[in-house]
Amino acid sequence: MCKEIYDLIAKELYRQQSTIELIASENFTSKAVMLAQGSILTNKYAEGYINKRYYGGCEFIDEVESLAIDKVKKLFKCNYANVQPHSGSQANQAVFLALLKPGDTILAMDLNSGGHLTHGAKPNLSGKFFNAVHYCVNKDSYLIDYNEVEMLAQQHKPKLIIVGYSAYSRKINFATFKEIADKVGAYLLADIAHIAGLVATEYHSSPIPYAHVVTSTTHKTLRGPRGGLILTNDESISKKINSAVFPGMQGGPLMHVIAAKAIAFSEALMPQYKEYINQVMLNAKVLAKLLQDRGYNILTGGTDNHMLLVDLRGKNITGQEAEYLLDAAGITCNKQVMPFDTTSPTITSGIRLGTPACTTRGFKENDFITVGKYIADILDNIAIIKSAKKNEDITITEIENSLDSVITHTKQHVQELCNSFPIYTN
């Protein structure tokens, strides 16, 4: 291996091992998944579908893809699946290509309320090719406002309604979305990229009986390789989806990744996986309560899934400051725009925290109480320093210098905790 790359991988392994990973969209996949991704399957071109390839020598490739499809259909209890999308974004784009025409109207959640870029955000292809209308969460409860969704649907008559989010911590009523979609004759797309693991284990209701199409990533709570998938119970839609993925969106599928997806689906079908998802949710609730008890505003008052959103507007702390200084202390998270946020997306007014990765390492409730204390200690000290400066401008570097001893002390404790939960042995 190239020494430079080897050294960088070693450094990244050390970073992952020695830090607390709280980015809600990240996880630690199994060695089996990684072995499949690094296998000789990466050598094979396989444009097309099972028994309909444009290259020879695909007899074993067909079996690999067939296994992945069978396992994901069993996992989500659906009739049709496409496992070829390279990402969740491309899965969504394939749905648009299959069901929409340029200029059609789509209705989805506003980015600041927790929606995703691929749901019609202006910088994204979905916002450039389609007329995107967005609904928001309720200004008081920060919950989905189903009345507003229906009002906008009746007003704009979208061709497609999207449900599913990247920053929403409560359960989704797919049945209500189905009723709204039916009233205006719209397709319903459920993007379950974040909650796929909860849906697979029935800790969250499934959109399969309600949505025309379901998309997801295969990493995040599913703990698989980075990739996408598309599910449906409608045969005619499945044919359109297949054509949209290939030849519409992609060329040759990544067979080494599809093999890794099959392994991840197999792992998710095991009883231990349901126990894992339950622990993910317990850990998220404990972390949310600890931060609430320390005086921090958790949007919606808690969480029903794997993530929580910490609104820092009342503490005079930006998401950028929190992310940077927590990272300095060995705690990785991401700054997050809050509903009705007036700051830049590069600054933000809060952070998003997730429990899947550390739960994979073996963290339980008591460990997350400890983690929550570390987070609150850092945030408390940021607030104290900024309060002392009153209205004076202060840079993140200046805050970091003032917090040097606190950051150093916290980082030592973080590393001690992480050493008790190795990611990969041997």
From Swiss-Prot:
GO terms for cellular component: cytosol. It holds the Pfam family SHMT. (6S)-5,6,7,8-tetrahydrofolate binds at L111, G115, H116, L117. It catalyses: (6R)-5,10-methylene-5,6,7,8-tetrahydrofolate + glycine + H2O = (6S)-5,6,7,8-tetrahydrofolate + L-serine. It is found in: Cytoplasm. GO terms for molecular function: glycine hydroxymethyltransferase activity; pyridoxal phosphate binding. GO terms for biological process: glycine biosynthetic process from serine; tetrahydrofolate interconversion. Gene3D superfamilies: Aspartate Aminotransferase, domain 1 (3.90.1150.10), Type I PLP-dependent aspartate aminotransferase-like (Major domain) (3.40.640.10). HAMAP family: SHMT. It is an enzyme of class 2 (transferase). Catalyzes the reversible interconversion of serine and glycine with tetrahydrofolate (THF) serving as the one-carbon carrier. This reaction serves as the major source of one-carbon groups required for the biosynthesis of purines, thymidylate, methionine, and other important biomolecules. Also exhibits THF-independent aldolase activity toward beta-hydroxyamino acids, producing glycine and aldehydes, via a retro-aldol mechanism. Belongs to the SHMT family. InterPro entries: PyrdxlP-dep_Trfase (IPR015424), PyrdxlP-dep_Trfase_major (IPR015421), PyrdxlP-dep_Trfase_small (IPR015422), Ser_HO-MeTrfase (IPR001085), Ser_HO-MeTrfase-like (IPR049943), Ser_HO-MeTrfase_PLP_BS (IPR019798), SHMT-like_dom (IPR039429). The keyword Cytoplasm applies. Its cofactor is pyridoxal 5'-phosphate. The keyword Disulfide bond does not apply. Homodimer. The record marks H219 as: Plays an important role in substrate specificity. Its EC number is 2.1.2.1. The modification N6-(pyridoxal phosphate)lysine is found at K220. This is Serine hydroxymethyltransferase. Keywords: Amino-acid biosynthesis, Cytoplasm, One-carbon metabolism, Pyridoxal phosphate, Transferase. Pathway: One-carbon metabolism; tetrahydrofolate interconversion; Amino-acid biosynthesis; glycine biosynthesis; glycine from L-serine: step 1/1.
